[in-house]
Amino acid sequence: MTSRIRFLMCPPDHYDVDYVINPWMEGNIHKSSRDRAVEQWQGLYQILKEHAIVDLVTPQKGWPDLVFTANAGLVLGDNVVLSRFLHKERQGEEPYFKEWFEGNGYTVYELPKDLPFEGAGDALLDREGRWLWAGYGFRSELDSHPYLAKWLDIEVLSLRLIDERFYHLDTCFCPLANGYLLYYPGAFDSYSNRLIEMRVAPEKRIAIAEADAVNFACNTVNVESIVIMNKASDALKQSLTGVGFQVLETPLTEFLKAGGAAKCLTLRVTEPVRDEVHANVYVESRIIRIEGHLLDSGLINRALDMIVDTGGSFQVLNFNLGEQRQSTSAAEVKVSAPSHEVMEEIISLLIDLGAVDLPQDERDAKLEPVIQDGVAPDDFYVSTIYPTEVRINGQWIKVENQRMDGAIAITQTPNGLLAQCKILRDLKAGEQVIVDVLGIRTIRKTESREQRNTQEFSFMSGGVSSERRVELVVEQVAWELRKIRDAGGKVVVTAGPVVIHTGGGEHLSRLIREGYVQALLGGNAIAVHDIEQNMMGTSLGVDMKRGVAVRGGHRHHLKVINTIRRHGSIAKGVESGIIRSGVMYECVRNQIPFVLAGSIRDDGPLPDTQMDLIKAQEEYAKHLEGAEMILMLSSMLHSIGVGNMTPAGVKMVCVDINPAVVTKLSDRGSIESVGVVTDVGLFLSLLTQQLDKLTSPYVSKVG
């Protein structure tokens, strides 16, 4: 027997499932057998006594979970951090555990009352004593980890739990002797799994399957080469014996009903201290402020959910609620993250929501030089669609050329510092680029409940009068088109060939002819099939009047391409009279600029199609400047490209029959975006009908 190893247990005299505080308890209230629980506990107790010393804490009536002594606290040397239970059903256990620790000569540290930490259930020492694995996500708070590092003088590695079945770290994670680790990867987020893989060599990691995990195979007591558990599959037992462990199974099914097994029923109270190991914690905290219609728009919920979903935790320090419906609210939130990497990701997302530092915490943005043309520093800040300002030398500077997925470059000009979004290929050596997430803020429009609730419209979806809902969107779009046209504004259309295939070409042609469109962006295909329809009456070989395939029609588009190539351009085809109507005809006749961006699948292509991708992107960006509205008509590829080039504030209408496409295009966080799930030909037909109701015939000033 290894007499120096000691464990603390509590007899199950008052054990029962009296309430539900984890998924395992659901359906098991008062369904546990006291006699069987005592028998199973005694089985574990006797096995453990053969390999270690076992101390007992006195059971207390009214506290059925006192039997799970792993949650008493966390012991290292002569120090113990007492648990702060999340649920009131267990908070009454704290004084009894504190009394036992103090009576046995331990120095007891107590966390603030509002900071949950559930002891060795959520904090497991590496069996070599090198560091402490600390879990968070369901019971213990991430903010408790710096206290553990300070009081126990040890490096703390934070792991986020994401499967509610494994609500404590010890239900899915068990450090073993000789540097081995038994764990269930599915219980952790990707960052935590990566951290585990960085710290534990592949040959030392024993990853278990879900079938073993739900039998609490990781809730194991390890005494040197002995592992004591509820149950293990033959494959798991073979893995453990293969690396030198002796597996001892003892049934603990009565305790599984409350969400615990062998490890939960024990607390190791002799944990040696390594003198060369000292405190190190990677948890970062930062206080942010967010303002707006936080409640009725759901903004505060989105911000807090975003923090948790990205791997952080939060504490709302102050919340000032607007006094009236039109008043805005403000909140100060402490954000914590397990590492700087995760903190950067969280803050980047919060910046998109309009979060800012407290005035006293404002700092200049961090800059790093571009070393190689077209290559940003590794940690560069990725720009978004929202108007952005960066803090340089104590001054906030507006970022020019706002767009998604760029870097923010800082250059000195005769008129002062210039901050502008640049795509990576345009970066030049010597420029300074914003890195990290300090000194960055976005300027967001105040968002109300009404705006959030009218984001996306579906045609023929569930609900009452869904067709009417699409008509309502069409009415709004028509009204906006009319207003922009009459004010001399700019509307850009990006369209795919489906517009032609669905019979929408004549309606789009009319929009161009009547002055509602100031630029057309698309690919080779929309022009090819538009011209095919107007020269040969087919689109992709289908007769547009009868809706049937024409014999040999699959060759029509190639003949059209060949004809236009012979003339040299679409404009020359119009001038020669071979193109007499259609979308491209109206663009040429009304001097509406168009850009056709090529792709690897293009036939021909048409002579007007820009096959240089970089030039095509530049031409797209040029024609998007000054746009007030963009109609994205059934072209996911080109529409996504346009969306990435477009700053917030531009109204976007995304139309596609595929809901996934609409969601992808419209869900960019812009409150000006509207998604319409419907047939694009039908949408354009409804749109022109609605415009007829709003306006008198329009006479073109050109031609």
Swiss-Prot record:
Going by the UniProt record, its keywords in alphabetical order are:
Hydrolase, Lyase, NAD, Nucleotide-binding
Binding positions for NAD(+) per the UniProt entry: 524-525, 603, 635-638, 656, 679-680
Q: Which residues bind L-ornithine?
A: 22, 90, 139, 168, 264
Gene Ontology MF annotations: hydrolase activity; lyase activity; nucleotide binding
Is 4Fe-4S set as a keyword in this record?
no
Instruction: Explain the consequences of disrupting this gene.
Output: Neither proline nor glutamate is observed in filaments of the deletion mutant when incubated in the presence of arginine or ornithine. Mutant shows substantial diazotrophic growth.
**Record's cofactor remark:** Required for ornithine cyclodeaminase activity. Can be partially substituted by NADP(+).
Provide the catalytic activity annotation: L-arginine + 2 H2O + 2 H(+) = L-ornithine + 2 NH4(+) + CO2; L-ornithine = L-proline + NH4(+)
What the record says about the induction of its expression is:
Expressed at higher levels in vegetative cells than in heterocysts.
Q: What happens after mutating residue 139 to A?
A: Shows residual arginine dihydrolase activity
Q: Does the keyword Membrane apply?
A: no
Which cofactor names does the annotation list? NAD(+)
| Any Pfam family hit | Saccharop_dh_N
Per the record, what about its domains? The N-terminal domain (NTD) is responsible for arginine dihydrolase activity. The C-terminal domain (CTD) is responsible for ornithine cyclodeaminase activity. The L-ornithine generated from arginine is probably channeled between the active sites of arginine dihydrolase (NTD) and ornithine cyclodeaminase (CTD).
Self-association or partners: how does it assemble?
A: Homotetramer.
Report the family membership. In the N-terminal section; belongs to the DDAH family.
- The name this protein carries in UniProt is Bifunctional arginine dihydrolase/ornithine cyclodeaminase AgrE
Tell me what organism the protein belongs to. Answer: Nostoc sp. (strain PCC 7120 / SAG 25.82 / UTEX 2576)
Q: Which gene encodes it?
A: agrE
